[in-house]
Amino acid sequence: MKTKSIEMTLLFDLYGELLTEKQQQLFDLYYNEDLSLAEIADLLQISRQGARDGIVRSENLLREFDEILKLSSAMEQNSQIAALASQIILSTESDEVKKFAEQIKSLALSQGGIYGI
């Protein structure tokens, strides 16, 4: 999968509900169903340019939402914290340290780490 597709899919998972139903539909057909602009236009009985404009508008809105709310950044940070906690768990022999590291990892993942979604 392309980097842009991964980024857009992640942003859609976070903010997709903020888009209109039509924008959600266009996004889903393009990114999740992997339809071409021509196929989307034919299916929805709109122009190819209309399909493209709707998808681009959806992408821009998702990026704007993330710029304001910064959920993807927080999620990435929580994933990094969880990964570091996992390293601590593997590298220490202290049961007490392992216990605290497990708690940190669990908290980070429950707050939206990549693996906690």
Predicted regions mapped to residue ranges:
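Intrinsically disordered, low-complexity basic tails/linkers immediately adjacent to helix-turn-helix/homeobox/MYB/SANT
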Residues: L69-V97
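C-terminal flanking helix
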Residues: E59-D66
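Short, Lys/Arg-enriched N-terminal segment that forms or immediately precedes the first helix
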Residues: T3-G16
